[in-house]
Swiss-Prot record:
Source organism of this protein record: Aquifex pyrophilus
GO cellular component: large ribosomal subunit
Keyword set, alphabetical order: Ribonucleoprotein, Ribosomal protein, RNA-binding, rRNA-binding
Residue ranges of coiled coil: none
Single Gene Ontology BP annotation: translation
Record-given protein name: Large ribosomal subunit protein uL10
Amino acid sequence: MAEFNREAYSERERSAASMKTLLRKQELVNSYKERLQRSNGFVVFFNFQGIDAYPLTLLRLDIKDLKGEIVVGKNTLFYRAFSDTALSDHRDIFIGPTAALFAYEDPVAVTKKLVEFLKETFDKEWEGRIKGGLLDYKYISPEQVKELAELPSKEELIAKLLGVMMAPVTQLAMTLKAVPQKLVLVLKAIEEEKSKGGQ
C-alpha cells in the first residue's frame, strides 16, 4: 500500500484553491465590465472610508431605487476591469478605499444622490471623496462629476418641458373661460340698468 504523501496533497489543495481564487477574481472583473456596459459607459468612483455600514447600506438602497448600484471592490480588480477604457491613464483613481457608482437609467439622479450623501456625511471634506469616473466611456474628473450633480435630473427636465408645453394650453383655457364670465357680467349689468330704468 502506498504511503500518504501529505506535502503532495497540500500542494494540490493549494493549487486548487489558487485556481478557485483566480476564477473568482476573473468573475468579478467580468461583472464590473458588464455593469459598465449596462450603464452605457457611466461609472463614478468615490472613497468610502469613514462611512459606517448602515449609512452605506441606506445609500445603496436609495441608489437602487434610482436604478443604480454601488459596488465596493478591490482596486486591482477595478483597474483590470477598466484598463481598456479612458481610465487606463488615471490609475490614481484606484488608490485607497474605492467604491463604484453605476447608473442604469439617469446618471444625473444617482450622482446627485451620492453628492448629497457625501455632503451630509463629510460636510466640507466631501469634495475630496470623489475620484472621477466615466460618462459615455469618456473620462470625467472629480470637478466634472460635481457639475453633473448640479444638472437637472431627467424627471426635472421632463417636468419643466411639460410646464412649457402646457402653458399655452392653460392660457387658452383661462381665456376661453373668461369670455363667458365677461358676457355674464355684461348681461347682468344690462339687466340691472333696465331694472333701475324701469323703477
